[in-house]
Swiss-Prot record:
Annotated protein name in UniProt: 5-oxoprolinase subunit A
Keyword field: ATP-binding, Hydrolase, Nucleotide-binding
InterPro entries referenced in this protein's UniProt entry, alphabetically: Glyco_hydro/deAcase_b/a-brl, LamB/YcsF/PxpA-like
Cited Pfam families: LamB_YcsF (PF03746)
One biological process term in Gene Ontology: carbohydrate metabolic process
Reactions catalysed: 5-oxo-L-proline + ATP + 2 H2O = L-glutamate + ADP + phosphate + H(+)
NCBIfam families: PRK05406.1-3, PRK05406.1-5
Amino acid sequence: MKYIDLNADIGESYGNFKVGEDEAILPLVSSINVACGFHAGDFMVMAECCKLAREYGVNLGAHPGYPDLWGFGRRSIPYTKEEITNMLLYQLGALSAFARAEGVKITHVKPHGALYNDAVVKVEVAEAVARAVWVFDAEIAIVTLPYGRLFEIASEMGLTVIREGFADRGYLPDGRLVPRNQEGAKKTGDEAVAQAIALAEGWVKAVDGTVIKAEVDTICVHGDNIEAVKLAQKINRELLNKNIYVQAWRKKRA
């Protein structure tokens, strides 16, 4: 029997600005990554997401980013290692308080946007992210691409690393994601569903047609995608057709 974790980035609304359908996607995934107020999210949204994590029994992850509401955390901003570590500790502490109030715990950390991408290629950023998780709680896992600096450094530190693939993003031949400002960056509809199935089976096709080996533990559906709920429904259905079951990565598997 084969299993795969399906995760969604949620909690990216704040104030009167609404993004995604958080509760609608909860029955369709096994893990969530909650924005922690720097790139998106606020104290009311974070509290609600922790409540939903408890009600639906999904893994609760922190989704910290650069302090960049204007750019939705998708702009690379130069910070020192100490600044990056501390900005993550700040965000982890905030989400942890809401999680504790709901009787749940943070199981993983997945950096957001530019911070995620920077940690893949920049040693200093990867070290800062890994250190933040280590000093906050070394039992918490890090979610990242199945290669790159963060994967290597976190593994060397003895942290649990969850290898991630993306249903709705294009891939470069070297396994990195296609930058959002380039052609082929996004996958939609049946193309995204097909890519999710391929990832669950251990491979993915790059924008140039190259087939890449991609052993992943979890597959992401971006919650800010307007078709996220429909996409997650289709992915669930097609995975079942392949006898692949959606299950949170921390649960014991047969």
